[in-house]
C-alpha cells in the first residue's frame, strides 16, 4: 500500500467537501442531533467556505491518497489563520480527517509527519490541535504521536456547545526520525 500526500487544489473542492462531510458524519454523527450536524455541514463545508480556507495564505491542505483514492486529508494553519491565538511559534493541525475504511493503516501517522515537516520548515517549535473530549480513539492516537493536553476550548456544533481538548506536541531536531 502506497500513501501519497498531495496538496489540495481549487479543482478538488467538491471532493474535499465530500470527504469532510463523510468523515465528520462517521465520527460525530452517532453522538449529535441531525439538525446540528446539517447546520455544521452547511456552514463549515460549503464550497465557498472551503474555497476561502483553501486560498488563505497561512493555511495548507493535503490529501492522503492510497492507490489513487482519497483516504483523508490534513489542514494546517500558522499565524493569524490559527483558530486560537497560540503564538508565533506554533502550527495548528485544524483537521486531520481519515475515512473510516482507511483508519488504522498509517494514514493519520503519515499526515502528522507531514504537519511536523511543515512546522519544521516554517521554524515552528510546537504543533497543536483540538480534539473532542469524547473522541477517545483520536486522543489515544495523538498520545502515541507525542501530544499532551495543555488546555481546552469550546466548540459550537449547530446549537450544541461542546468541549475540545487542546493538545500540544513540542518539536525538536529528532522529531522526524
Residue spans for each PLM region:
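Conserved phosphate-binding and hydrolysis motifs of nucleotide-dependent enzymes
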Residues: 68, 72, 106-108, 146
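Conserved acetyl-CoA-binding loop-helix of GNAT-fold acetyltransferases
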Residues: 104-117, 140-144
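Extreme N-terminal starter segment of soluble prokaryotic enzymes
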Residues: 2-4
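Short coil/turn segments at alpha/beta junctions that flank glycine-rich nucleotide-binding fingerprints
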Residues: 105, 122-125
